[in-house]
Amino acid sequence: MNYTDISHGLGVPFGGFGTGYFVFGRHGFVNFNVDGYPEQQQTAEYPHGTLWDYTAENPSCGPIALYADIDSVRWLLQKDSHPSIEGNPSVFVKNEVKMPYGKTVFLAGDIRIELLMYSSLKRFDLTRTSIPACVIEYTVTNTGCNSHTVSLGLAYDTDKYTAETKNNLLVLNEGNGGMAFGINKTNSQVLSAGETGNYVGAIGWYYPEFVTQGLARDDIILRHNSIKDYKETEHRKGYIRNYTLRYENAADVATDALLHYEEWKDDINAWHGAFSFPDETAKLLFGSYSSVITSSLYTTQGYYFEIEQPHGCLNTMDVSVYSTWLYMMNWPELEEIDLYQYIRTIPMEGETAGKVWHSLWADSAHYVEEAIFVIRVWRYVLWSGNRQILEDAWPVCKAALEYLYSTEGSGALIDNISGNQSYDAWKMPGICNYVNNQWLYALFSFERMSNQLGKEAIVLGKKVSELLPEALKQYNEALWDEKEGYWYAYKVTEKSNRLPFGNAVFSDQLFGFWAASLDPEAYGILSNEQCVRALKKIYVHNRVYVPNGDYYCWLNGALPEKEKTPSIEMNDGIYEHCGYHALCCWICAETGMASLMYRFGLPQTGEDVFYNVAKGIGNNHLAAGEYNRGVDENMKPETLRYEPGKDTPRFPAYPRYKCAWEHPIAILNLQADLDNIYLNPAKNVNIALSEIRMGSDVFSVTVEKNWDTCLVGGIEAKPVLKRNEGKHTVEFIKTK
């Protein structure tokens, strides 16, 4: 994977998992979020304001600036003057990224300064991935004809910090924490004409406390059902960041970075080397790490929060079901931590017993999260082989399904009045495809869990073995269009609101299957023929060409008479235009569709969808939005008119984008039960993945395009790996 030019944007975020961060690029330091809860002002203003604008020309400067003293002149390494720090602006040349590396080049007179910056990242090692530091490797070249004296350092806002020097480090203190900067050459260096000098510096920071937005308090999270007794005024203590378990101050962090930066580079290079993908795929996958840096908060208690930027919601269920794929592939314990956060906080008594939070302790949705939670638990059990979480989660899953069915059940399906689900402004009242597809696979997943535990799967007195077939029958009767070959978005009922356009072609109509697709038995619920027909219909019918970018995107919904699709929007307010989100292209629905194409034997189509998503995001892969365009009243592509801050580019990146890490799993057609792992890769692409960890099972796999033979441990064999037998090497090779 090569570096990508992002000179048009604000720059690259630096920091670790849950450490806070800053961005560095053409404007120097911006989006300074090392302290507290990140992007509070942006969240408070949303959907108004422009703080999300990744291409802004006049962002607020951070309180520090890198400088180069050349002879007697101070140059700040940023393209504009700083309002609080003296120095001449430099000439910005370019900014490139290969996450988590960022390269920025400036000219300060005759001196060319290239900065290679990065923070620590180590796959499968959260401790090494949560260090609040940034290394800066300087390559300084005298491009002039005369010698120059060069000195490098960090300048700061004197109104914000008090400074002292300790062990050759500049230490900047303020009331709630501080920063430290060190460099390996503290004396001025003389560079002759044409000479290059190399330096290594590091910035460390230390801000121990943060307070989240909403009701997320550590004295709630570990007390089952205590939410009913919540009093906000009693729970305003902050959390302590996890990195305080290892460091006492910012100077300790900066010193650690200067001592171990070469190891950090080795770890990063090993991460890159563990995967071999086509460049566009690699760019998306590694680029989505931007969202890890900008969205995570990690506590000393070991649990964490992921912010649904720009909303401030924490660990949002219908976001995490997507975004957690990055964690499952690199730090899989994080998915277990998050699921236990829900297991411990979902009420288990009273009227709301089993109600699953939309996001932790706040913003409960009407009826969309319970089924997602059940599928997500089973998916992680299959991934990890962890039977303990299966036992711990089972009663909560049962309660969740019973809550959903008792409040919204109708016949064997789910019937909701308003249809308020994950597609927000596009309400789908009555029998909603999105929710009922989940419902089918949640019932399936619960029965699979129950069988493993030797329990009978019963929901409100009904055996799931009888409820699921009836639900499947009613689902097809209500929503399947045999002539056109797809399931309707929704069907209104006597109970529900009477919104029109239920026969829209909904791009995410197989979301429940996508979430359950690790399980080989999931492929027998809906018929493969129906699924293939539906995917082909969506691919052709919902596709929109974006000439300014030369790529395709896929609408969330399109009417059978496609040209009439804009009529789905029914203006009923300034912000939530009813139906508007049908006219938008949701990145995760698109990537999910690409994966489903692979799952159902349509690899060329799947790769085409994923390629177009990647092309649409382009060099904004650090700033992917929730969407990548919508359409206007004439079906012409446009930036989202009501929510430009959710379109691409927007910063910080929207967390669902991390689901790109599920794409290689779909290419491998990886499936698993608790006895075996099954592989049957597509034959249209060369890929390699080293050390996929699924609990105690670890395997590496390489796939050669048009393969015809499978080797397991160097011996020709079926691609079936017995679980709990350690490490495996699997090769799919072409011999003919």
Language-model region placement:
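Acidic/polar, glycine-enriched structural segments that form the non-catalytic walls/loops
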Residues: 1-2, 10, 108-109, 113-115, ...
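Short, surface-exposed recognition loops and adjoining beta-strand edges that mediate ligand/DNA contacts
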Residues: 7, 474-507
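Acidic-aromatic substrate-binding/catalytic surfaces of carbohydrate-active enzymes
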Residues: 17-84, 177-179, 208-212, 216, ...
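Non-catalytic C-terminal accessory modules of carbohydrate-active enzymes
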Residues: 18, 29-31, 37-41, 50-51, ...
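Helix-terminus loop motifs that line ligand-binding clefts
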Residues: 36-105, 333-422, 547-569, 609-651
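Aromatic-rich carbohydrate-recognition surfaces in CAZymes
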Residues: 53-56, 63-72, 142, 197, ...
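Active-site core of glycosidic bond-cleaving carbohydrate-active enzymes
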Residues: 316-347, 370, 395, 402, ...
